[in-house]
């Protein structure tokens, strides 16, 4: 894990992007984002900047939480994300299309 908060944020978004791609999704499919920050005042600007590069829409909903610590002492930021995949066809297609 990198020491700088900027590098940790970049790494978190790269890993999130990789998970999304693996599932056939992208950042545009996110519906909820929760970020946890140690020393939130020191890192919020960098987080917003990096987030804006990855997520270019107004969505997803974003909750920002300041925390005393994370799972390991050197972790400064953590991201929880929820994405939604659109289902095309199948038995629910009529309900979705109406």
Residue spans for each PLM region:
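Short, polar/acidic, helix-capping and beta-turn segments at strand->helix junctions
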Residues: 1-98
């Amino acid at each position: 894990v990198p020491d700088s908060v900027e590098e940790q944020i970049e790494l978190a978004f790269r890993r999130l992007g990789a998970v999304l791609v693996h599932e056939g999704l992208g950042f545009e499919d996110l519906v909820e984002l929760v970020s946890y920050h140690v020393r939130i005042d020191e890192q919020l600007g960098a987080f917003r900047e990096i987030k804006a590069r990855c997520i270019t829409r107004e969505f997803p909903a974003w909750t920002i939480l300041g925390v005393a610590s994370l799972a390991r002492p050197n972790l400064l930021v953590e991201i929880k994300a929820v994405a939604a995949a659109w289902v095309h066809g199948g038995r629910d297609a009529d309900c979705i299309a109406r």
